[in-house]
């Protein structure tokens, strides 16, 4: 077999592969055996039809078609390995030449990982917030716990910040109604700023069944950037009632008997959470600076697949109802156009991050132990709210084992690189990154955390439609449309 590669762009290649017929004989024999099982001829048992009789019945073209499709996966993979290509997508394959009993030539075009020049991490300096785990932080954590056990009750008073309201919204521009900014029975917590500008200010002080009109600039839709008159009507008003922080609450909300014991436990949790936040901040800022120092082209097809994957994942929550999805976006002061722009930006960032980390992992070659891989599976299962065994079955069914292995490998490579970075907090205190990312201290959460999770959360382990080198398998090559010459074509094949 001979192969050559043509670089069509920084992210796409074209392989040309020639396979002599003497190397194709095992696939031809396999084709005869396979087709013999599918053909019933008088006088022959099934599967026992001689090759010459089978060829006379089906034609030489059918035999070659089967043999070539049997051959494609292994020869393509061999060519990819020979040229050390980091293939990201399934190839487009064409049979370009067939000389019966002489050779078969095919081309395969695919997106590949571009060449990436890695920065010197030891030159990177980052600054993060100091580690603060005081009584105020413990109080805030206790309040969060109380809120989980809180109840909503209707109140008869003006709306206040943090209240929960059900509202109707409508808007007009130039006296004409704006359909995409009209909704009824929308639930909203006052003060969270998630809906249109000026709404929270308008709501404060209103009463149930009261309406108010205010002006706001629309940020999306056909009237994006135009000033609209928005009318809001409060349909219901509730406040969250928190339980008292006493021993009874401690017994209700935890395994502790007293509020003092609960606070002590929360203090430890707060400290661990603050450390995790600081580690996450270090990781994210280091990765951001490393990417700023690196410029490379992104494979467009991979980005597009990532965009589609993100959109389909969101639409599943609306049972595929794009109209309902668009209405929600409008109620949030956004639009499909803005969503598409944001999604593409997110997809590009996810693909850029993964390609960079894959290159870093190839450079550093970190070893992933079985224990580390198991811990990552358990950590990821927890993120998705699944039992480890259930999650393992799901990723096996979706062929994502390789993708999860690649996650761990990227995380370890990044952690190793972060250990060489200069880190200080905003008070000027030096922080040794090895405390978080050293081999002994390194945990699954700190090594793979949000830097790699940013990509995986957007793509469910890998960018949609993308295959890393660790997980790629040429399992669809035989299904690729192949223009194999017919029986007549093979007789007149190019000499």
Curated annotation (Swiss-Prot):
Biased segments, Basic and acidic residues type: 425-437
Query: Keyword Chaperone, does the record have it?
Result: yes
**Known InterPro entries for this protein?**
PPIase_dom_sf, PPIase_FKBP_dom, Trig_fac, Trigger_fac_C, Trigger_fac_C_sf, Trigger_fac_ribosome-bd_bac, Trigger_fac_ribosome-bd_sf, Trigger_fact/SurA_dom_sf
Look up the record and give one Gene Ontology term from the biological process aspect: cell division
Task: Identify the Gene3D superfamilies for this entry.
Answer: 3.10.50.40, Trigger factor ribosome-binding domain, Trigger factor, C-terminal domain
Q: Which Pfam families match?
A: FKBP_C (PF00254), Trigger_C (PF05698), Trigger_N (PF05697)
Q: Which transformation does this protein catalyse, written as a reaction? A: [protein]-peptidylproline (omega=180) = [protein]-peptidylproline (omega=0)
EC number, UniProt record: 5.2.1.8
Give the molecular function GO annotations: peptidyl-prolyl cis-trans isomerase activity; protein folding chaperone; ribosome binding
Q: Boundaries of each PPIase FKBP-type domain copy? A: 162-243
Composition bias (Acidic residues) maps to 486-495
Top EC group:
isomerase
SUPFAM superfamilies hit by this protein? FKBP-like (SSF54534), Triger factor/SurA peptide-binding domain-like (SSF109998), Trigger factor ribosome-binding domain (SSF102735)
Composition skew (Low complexity), residue ranges: 450-461
Q: Write out the ranges of the annotated region (Disordered).
A: 425-495
Which NCBIfam families does this UniProt record tie to the protein?
A: tig
Domain writeup: Consists of 3 domains; the N-terminus binds the ribosome, the middle domain has PPIase activity, while the C-terminus has intrinsic chaperone activity on its own.
Functionally, this protein is described as follows: Involved in protein export. Acts as a chaperone by maintaining the newly synthesized protein in an open conformation. Functions as a peptidyl-prolyl cis-trans isomerase.
- Which protein family is named in the record? Belongs to the FKBP-type PPIase family. Tig subfamily.
Tell me which HAMAP family the record gives. Answer: Trigger_factor_Tig (MF_00303)
**What is the protein's given name?**
Trigger factor
């Amino acid at each position: 077999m001979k192969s050559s590669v043509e670089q069509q762009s920084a992210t796409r290649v074209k392989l040309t592969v020639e396979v002599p017929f003497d190397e194709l004989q095992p696939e031809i024999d396999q084709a005869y055996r396979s087709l013999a099982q599918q053909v019933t001829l008088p006088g022959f048992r099934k599967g026992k039809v001689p090759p010459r009789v089978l060829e006379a019945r089906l034609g030489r073209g059918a035999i070659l078609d089967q043999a070539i499709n049997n051959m494609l996966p292994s020869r393509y993979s061999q060519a990819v390995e020979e040229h050390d290509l980091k293939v990201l997508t399934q190839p487009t394959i064409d049979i370009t030449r067939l000389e019966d009993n002489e050779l078969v030539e095919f081309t395969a075009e695919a997106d590949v990982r571009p060449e990436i020049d890695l920065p010197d991490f030891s030159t990177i300096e980052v600054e993060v917030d100091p580690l603060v785990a005081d009584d105020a932080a413990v109080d805030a954590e206790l309040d969060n716990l109380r809120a989980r056990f809180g109840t909503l009750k209707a109140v008869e008073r003006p709306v206040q910040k943090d209240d929960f309201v059900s509202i109707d919204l409508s808007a007009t521009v130039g006296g004409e109604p704006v359909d995409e900014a009209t909704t009824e029975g929308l639930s909203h917590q006052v003060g969270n700023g998630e809906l249109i500008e000026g709404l929270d200010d308008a709501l404060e002080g209103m009463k149930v069944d009261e309406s108010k009109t205010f002006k706001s600039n629309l940020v999306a839709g056909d009237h994006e950037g135009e000033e609209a008159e928005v009318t809001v009507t409060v349909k219901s008003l509730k406040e969250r009632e928190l339980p008292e922080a006493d021993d009874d609450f401690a017994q209700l909300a935890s395994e502790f008997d007293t509020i003092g014991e609960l606070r002590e436990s929360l203090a430890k949790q707060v400290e661990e959470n603050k450390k995790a936040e600081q580690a996450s901040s270090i990781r994210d800022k280091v990765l951001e600076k490393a990417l700023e120092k690196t410029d490379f082209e992104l494979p467009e097809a991979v980005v597009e697949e990532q965009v589609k994957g993100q959109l389909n994942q969101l639409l599943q929550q609306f049972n595929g109802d794009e109209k309902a999805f668009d209405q929600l976006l409008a109620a949030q002061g956004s639009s499909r156009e803005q969503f598409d722009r944001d999604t593409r930006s997110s997809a590009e960032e996810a693909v850029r991050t993964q390609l960079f980390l894959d290159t870093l992992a190839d450079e550093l070659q970190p070893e992933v132990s079985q224990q580390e891989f198991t811990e990552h599976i358990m950590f990821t299962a927890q993120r998705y709210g699944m039992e480890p065994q259930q999650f393992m079955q799901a990723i096996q069914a979706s062929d994502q084992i390789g993708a999860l292995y690649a996650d761990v490998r990227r995380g370890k490579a990044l952690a190793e690189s972060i250990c060489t970075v200069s880190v200080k907090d905003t008070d000027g205190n030096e922080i040794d990154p090895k405390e978080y990312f050293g081999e002994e201290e390194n945990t699954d959460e700190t090594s793979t955390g949000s830097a790699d999770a940013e990509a995986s959360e957007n793509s469910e382990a890998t960018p949609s439609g993308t295959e890393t080198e660790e997980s790629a398998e040429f399992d669809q090559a035989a299904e690729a449309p192949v223009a194999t010459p017919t029986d007549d074509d093979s007789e007149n094949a190019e000499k």
